C-alpha cells in the first residue's frame, strides 16, 4: 500500500466519517460474549449457529467468517459445528492495558445474501500480576519542626490487573512516628500518604527506615513492597511555591524530539541552600518517563520521543519542586496532544475472491473495512475504484464496504481485471492508500463453436485407397478449458438415400475427414453432407457446416468402339469404288469413353494397313478417307487397324479393325466371305465370280457404253453415301457414358445396313444410301469441311 499526497479525483466516491465507535447499527444485530484471559487455545466461547438462530450447516453453506477490527485472528470459527473458539491465549493486559472493561470487537460475515453481524468479546481479568513499586527505595527528607498530622504523598505501586485484582490497600511497617492513609484520585486510583504522628527530633534519630506494602484484592492476594528511607533535617521555614498549581499546554503530535513543551517555575522564600529548588516528576508512569524529560534546575519539560495522538491524546504529569532543606511542593501539568494528519487510511480486507464467473452481475468480490486513526477532518475518507471498470462499491455498517460487479462480465472480451481501491482522507496534506486486486473472470459456456468456413469443398480423385484423408474441417470456441474443447461429428444426411456412413468418417478430436471406400466418379460425381462441432460445456453448445465432396475423374476407362462392332461376329466390309478421288469418306470409327474431361478426349490413328499410304484417319473425328487416287494395281481387299486413344494420364487406348473392298461399280453384287471358314469362303467366292462373269459377258456389249457414262456421272454425286454399314439405332450400352462434344460420335450419326456377313446362302443387299441425321446447327460446318476435303485432308497415316 502506498501513502502519499493527494489531489481530489473526479470519480465515483463514497464519503464517510470515522467515528470512535463506528456508524449505524441498523439491521446488523449485536452479540456480546466473554472469555477469561489466559485460557488455552481452542477454548469454547459460544455456538454461533444457535446464537444466531441458523440451521445446522448454514454457516458453512454461506461462507461464514469472523474478522476483527484490527485484522488479527483472535477467534476461530468451526463453520461445520458452529462453535466459536479462541485462536490463541488472550492476555488482557497486552490487549487492553489499563482499560476496563477489555473489549475485542469483531464481525461475523455471511454471503448469499451478504450480512454482517457485529459482536464483542469481553476478556475477563484474572489475578496474574503482583503489585510492583517502580523504586525499591523512596527517600523522604522531613524537617524536624514538621507539625504532627502532616501528610506526605508516596509513590503508588503499579498492578496491570484491573478491578478487584488491582491494588486495594497499602500498609506500613510498625513504627511510632508514622501511619498510612489511603487517598483516591480523579482517575479512580488510590495513593498512599505517610502521616506524621509524632514530632521528629534530629538529635535523637537522624534517619528512619520503613517498609511500604501494596496489596491487591485477588484471591489469593498478591503484594509488593518498597523501602521508605526518612532523613530528618534541621529547621527549614519556607516551602517552595509554584507560580501555578495547574499548567495546561498543547503539543502537536508531529512535534520533533527535543521540543520544549512547557516550563514550570517555583520559588522559595528561604535563603542559601534552603532556597535552591530542584524539579522532578512525581509518581510518574512509565509512559510519561519515556515520553518526557524535565530539567531539574530550570523546570523545562522537553519531548523525549514522538507523540502519537492515536495512542495517547493527553498527559497528566505531577511535578515536584524540592528546596535544599527537603521541603517540597507539587503542581500538575496537563498536556493535550493535537492530532495531525500523519496516518493514511487503512484498508482491511475481510473477504476476497480472485475469480468470478462471467455473466454474473451483482456478485460480491470483496468485503473490506476502512479505518483512519486520525480524527476530525483528518479521519474523514473518500473511497472509490476506477470509473472505467464494471464494478462499484456499496457501503455497509461499521465502515465496511462491499466490492460488487456492476453488470455481467464477458471473459471473451476481457479475462482479467486489475482493480485499484483508493481510500483518501480529507486532512492536510491529504493521504491515500491504494489496494490492488487482480480478478480473473472464469469461463461460462456461452459461446458455441464456430467453423472457420460456413461451407467446405473437398476434392478427391476416384479410385482412392480406403481410409484416405480427404480434408479437414476446423471450428474454434471462444470459451476456455473444457468449454472450448470441440468434438466433431457427422450429422444425418438430408438425402435419405445417401449412404454417408459408408462413404466418409470424421475424427472427433481434430475434424479430419476420411474416405471409407474407393469412390467411382462414373457412379457418384459429388455429394453433400453436414458436420457438427459441439463443445464439452454444460449444457453443450454446437454448430454445423456444409461439406461438399467433388469426385475427380481418373482415367480408368479405355475408349470403347461403337462402330465398327468388335464383338467377334463377321466384320462389316466397307465398299469403295475404284474411281474414288483423294479424301473420299470410306467410313467413320465411332468410339466413346466413360471418363470425363480430357480423359474422354479421343484421338484416332491408323495403326496398321494392308497397303500403307492408301487410306488415312482424321485424328479428331475418326473419319477414314482415301489418301490418293485408286488404281487397278491396288489390291481389292484391305484390312485397316485404327488406334483410338484418350487424352488421360497415362492414356488408354482401344483398336478397331476395318475391312475395305475396292469395287469398280455398285451394280455388282458382293458378299463378304467369312474368315472363320476358309474352304467355304473359296466356294462362295467362286460362285460370285461365275455370276459376275456371266452377267458381264451378257451385258458387256449392250451396256458397256451406258454403264461407263452412268458410273462417271454418279461417281461424285453418290460418293458420300457409298459403302456404309449401319449401327442399330438405340441407347448405348449401360456401362458407357454418352459424351457430347468431346470428339466422339453423336448418337444421331447413323448408317443403314449395307451388307450382312456370315450368311451361307449368298444373300445380299445392294447399297442404299440415306441422308445422315446431323444436328441442324452443325450442318453448315459439316458441309463446309467436306467441301474442302480435296485440298486439306488432315489424314493420320
From Swiss-Prot:
Its main location: membrane. Glycans are attached at residues 169, 418, 567. Residues 1-26 form the signal peptide. Residues 35-133, 138-242, 247-347, 352-451, 456-561, 568-671 form the Cadherin domain. Keywords: Calcium, Cell adhesion, Cell membrane, Glycoprotein, Membrane, Repeat, Signal, Transmembrane, Transmembrane helix. InterPro entries: Cadherin-like_dom (IPR002126), Cadherin-like_sf (IPR015919), Cadherin_C (IPR032455), Cadherin_CS (IPR020894), Cadherin_N (IPR013164), Protocadherin/Cadherin-CA (IPR050174). Residues 786-797 have a biased composition (Polar residues). The chain crosses the membrane at residues 691-711. GO terms for cellular component: membrane; plasma membrane; synapse. The keyword Glycoprotein applies. Residues 777-797 are annotated as: Disordered. It is a single-pass type I membrane protein. Residues 712-797 are cytoplasmic. Residues 27-690 are extracellular. The keyword DNA damage does not apply. It is found in: Cell membrane. One of its GO terms (biological process) is chemical synaptic transmission. Pfam families: Cadherin (PF00028), Cadherin_2 (PF08266), Cadherin_C_2 (PF16492). One of its GO terms (molecular function) is calcium ion binding. Potential calcium-dependent cell-adhesion protein. May be involved in the establishment and maintenance of specific neuronal connections in the brain. This is Protocadherin beta-9. The gene is PCDHB9.
